[in-house]
Amino acid sequence: MKKIAVLTSGGDAPGMNAAIRAVVRTAIYNGIEVYGVYQGYLGLINDDLKKLELGSVGDTIQRGGTFLYSARCPEFKDKEVRAKAIENLRSRGIDGLVVIGGDGSYRGAQRISEECPEIQTIGIPGTIDNDIPGTDYTIGFDSALNTIIESVDKIRDTASSHARTFIVEVMGRDCGDLALWAGLAVGAETIIVPEEKVDIKDVAEKIESGIKRGKKHSIVVVAEGVMGGQLCADELAKYIHVDARVSVLGHIQRGGSPTGQDRVLASRLGGHAVELLMDGKTALGVGIKQNQLTQTKFEDIFNNKGSKFDKQMYKLAQELSI
């Protein structure tokens, strides 16, 4: 292994810069040249690569986002387009590629490993949704979780002051981990996630029951993949008359300085990715389980989507929100 490239793809997540830093410094420490690919897979297609030195990643571990930029690249699904990207890697003598991102990013890496076996590929899970099998946590999840908690704590102050019900919409298209963990942490009265079917009438009855017990306000946390916050409020209004407001947290969840946990996680996974490349491994996603570094085949990751949801935690949240 003499030259590797690293890119970030898909939605940005706090801690991506820390992962890039770990990849670059681990590689250089072991005598490997590193090239940064700008704007994800689009950069591979356009040959937008730049050699990275130790100084290139100085003062980045605490920064949110990704200094390599990120972009969604649907055209990478085209085999002819991928062939151009692969040729760009070959022409530079790059024999290893580290991809930081989510499910779609991993699929692009798998295609490269299939169509050009001499270029090894390793995926690092970077997404706030925490929806990648093969790891307990993805880079950015803890940071986004803490952003949500801080925001909802402030929203609850207002909800309490005005005796209102607040519907808080958080990210999570197919995975409800952000909603579940945040809802449990802020003491939400109701948590609505894609993995568990919820009848809005039951939610309304629960809120009404609380009001009868003297409860003045409620917090409902809903994952965007189930329904929008406004739709949730409109549906509730069919069953109960409460002063309900909607707060869509949106892209604030992706921004900000990564937490200590995300910085450490990103550093460990970034270093491990380089070690796997040096060992001749390919088509693997790195992760962490029970605080131990792991690696999982891309195909196993794709075949186990939706397997991570913690039903016991959901049950606990239901019991604590009576």
From Swiss-Prot:
It catalyses: beta-D-fructose 6-phosphate + ATP = beta-D-fructose 1,6-bisphosphate + ADP + H(+). Allosterically activated by ADP and other diphosphonucleosides, and allosterically inhibited by phosphoenolpyruvate. Its main location: cytoplasm. Mg(2+) binds at D103. Gene3D superfamilies: 3.40.50.450, Phosphofructokinase domain. It is found in: Cytoplasm. Substrate binds at T127, I128, D129, R164, M171, G172, R173, E224, R245, H251, I252, Q253, R254. One of its GO terms (molecular function) is metal ion binding. Homotetramer. This is ATP-dependent 6-phosphofructokinase. It comes from Staphylococcus carnosus (strain TM300).
